[in-house]
Curated annotation (Swiss-Prot):
The modification N-acetylalanine is found at residue 15. It is found in: Endoplasmic reticulum; Plastid, Chloroplast, Plastoglobule. Residues 1-14 form the signal peptide. One of its GO terms (biological process) is response to cold. GO terms for cellular component: chloroplast thylakoid membrane; endoplasmic reticulum; plant-type vacuole; plasma membrane; plastoglobule; secretory vesicle; thylakoid. It comes from Arabidopsis thaliana (Mouse-ear cress). The gene is PLAT1. The keyword Plastid applies. It holds the Pfam family PLAT. This is PLAT domain-containing protein 1.
Length: 181
């Protein structure tokens, strides 16, 4: 009987410690991207699209291939086509503060490398993180044959310029890097 009195509280303590430890090992957030491709003729692309999302301190999450990381539209769906609203939702480490900047990049591959992007909306949700939504108006071609002749669009809605929050200007922005895919 005495063993049972000691064993039961010990097992409860062990279960509680394990639950807390496992909860802290899973700090991931869910990031959902809504990307609207323009309805302009030839606005769609077959290129691989990557993104980096930044918080106000310059910490960021990098996603090498949005479609491979978290495409929700199904296996036969053709992403980034004219007029489409494409949705991607996946897990990645939580950033310390809400997203406020975006680097959206096309690799320029495929038969149709040019891509006209209307906007990107990103929502963030996490167990111990503040839920947030950030809208980025792009209204730009990501192409080498159309103005502005860039495969990257950068939008910064941060209250402080990212450059002011980091010590190394022009290089990788800060210390926290996580390439998801």
């Amino acid at each position: 009987m005495a063993r049972r009195d000691v064993l039961l509280p010990f097992l409860l303590l062990l279960a509680t410690v394990s639950a807390v430890a496992f909860a802290e090992d899973d700090p991931d957030c869910v990031y959902t991207f809504y990307l609207r491709t323009g309805s302009i003729w030839k606005a769609g692309t077959d290129s691989i699209i990557s993104a980096r999302i930044y918080d106000k301190d310059g910490d960021y999450i990098g996603i090498k291939n949005l479609q491979a990381w978290a495409g929700l539209m199904g296996p036969d769906y053709n992403y980034f086509e004219r007029g489409n609203l494409d949705i991607f939702s996946g897990r990645a480490p939580c950033l310390p503060s809400p997203i406020c900047a975006l680097n959206l990049t096309s690799d320029g591959s495929g038969d149709h490398h040019g891509w006209y992007v209307n906007y990107v909306e990103i929502t963030t949700a996490g167990v111990h993180a503040q839920c947030s939504t950030q809208d980025f108006e792009i209204e730009q071609w990501l192409a080498t044959d159309t103005s502005p002749y860039e495969l990257t669009a950068v939008r910064n809605n941060c209250p402080v310029k990212l450059r002011d929050s980091v010590s190394r200007v022009g290089s990788e922005i800060r210390k926290k890097l996580s390439w998801v895919v």
